[in-house]
Amino acid sequence: MFRRSEKFSTDKTAQELRTKVLPLDQLARTIESVRKSGQRVVLCHGVFDLLHVGHLRHLKAARAFGDLLVVTITGDDFVNKGPGRPAFPSMLRAEMLAELEVVDFVSVVEEASAHPSIRAVKPDFFVKGNEYADPKKDISGKIVTERELVESFGGQLVFTEDITFSSSNLLNRYFNVHDQSAREYLADLRQTDFESQFNRTLDRIEKMRIVVVGETIIDRYVYVDAMGKAAKENIIATLYRDEEVFAGGVIAVANNLAAVCPNVELVTMIGDPAAGDNQEDLIRKNLAPSVDATFVYRPSGPTVQKTRFVEPTYVRKLFEIYHMDDTALPRNVQDSFRGLLSDKLAQADLVVVCDFGHGMIDAGTVDLLQKEAAFLAVNVQSNAGNIGYNLIDKYSRCDFMCVDAMEARLAVRDKHAGLPDIVTRRLPDLVDCRNFIVTHGRSGCYVRKGDGAVCIPSFGGAVVDTVGAGDAFFALSAPCVAAGADCEMAGFVGNVAGAIKIGIVGHRRYLSRFEIQRYVSTLLK
């Protein structure tokens, strides 16, 4: 089955190659030369993260369709199976495949689909496992476009029928991908039909009309290298390297909501164009195309900006500067804002409020939201700019509330309070709400379920950047509850969103429905 040498013999062209693993452009030239001899070329594509007997049988069956078998694998940065995947880097996966006698060539594709490899190889047969035979069961939707592309080159999409294993299932069962609490929780969840329930919930969310309200925040990352203590001052000197500017705050929430719902309206506050660059062009450029935005302009004030000075190697924040005017909006601006907000609330199935405490949402706006929202989901944030002044009890009622542990403890004025007691008793005493979730970083989240609390463990891998993780959690959990799911499902999905987000620097990209579904599916295998 396995060979010690990478040298092999199929024809003259192949004998001249020094290795089976080729860059995609070189593979294309090699296959073009091979095809001239009349050989039929077969292509398989996948992640092949943990090579197993199911893969071997699939590859042997694929080889039977032609004379030459090419296997392409998805590059590490494009594997959408959740944090911690792939378990093995692309070159190790490629090396393992190349050692199989049945495989003639291997290449790594730096894209999330098989399209580049299909274009390069132009296979006579593109072979997939029988789990892809029904296009409706392919949550990525790629099998349809891949079939069309293969057929455009005169090839044919075919399926193998044999024993089926899952690399994700094997990794989950036999490798310590998650800690003990997560493994036990997932083992119980696998005994239910959670995944199908979740997919039905997504289908309901897709039909909703969602209005998002909150402040836009510009997140600026200034990358610097620490040089050491300044000679004459008690400060650390740094060397400027680069910077990135992201549209964050409520923009991130709206964009993440747009991943699961095409009907998202946004009402947000930004700075006065007359007062300088209010970053409106950047904001509009970064909004998801399906998000319909309405801007409220703060007279004479800037768009809220948080500049973080960051050590780039490990994305460690050194210090932060706020640029903002967080005083209450002038009466005429507030009245105009409430008028347009009232019109939008009347048409919304779900109203998502991201209250960052920077002056947009006052008591009058809270009253309007509580009276007119059909389903009100609220996140009231405590941050360095408002600590102690923006607590959840500014809302007397809502339908779903999501805060982190510090925000919950501030609200109940007890820094040592147990989170289960906060979720089940103390928060409901403050706010008339049936659905509470309190997030707790690596410890997961606590959700109110019946008269008790359930702890849902976190699933994240290595933490790259925590900025926006709570917003991603809220953006996915809120519509789940509004669509009829219980808080346990909402908390699970929120943890999935947060786990994906902590692997992304700033807001370089937002979540997609496909990666959320794929990660849920991966966890439950």
Regions found by a protein language model. Give the residues of each.
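Conserved post-catalytic alpha-helical subdomain immediately downstream of the catalytic base
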Residues: 432-435, 459-523
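Glycine-rich phosphate/adenosyl-contacting loop at the front of the ribokinase-like
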Residues: 185-265, 457, 461-464
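Short internal beta-strands
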Residues: 68-74, 129-130, 265-270, 376-380, ...
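Histidine-anchored nucleotide/phosphate-binding helix
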Residues: 52-68, 245-260, 365
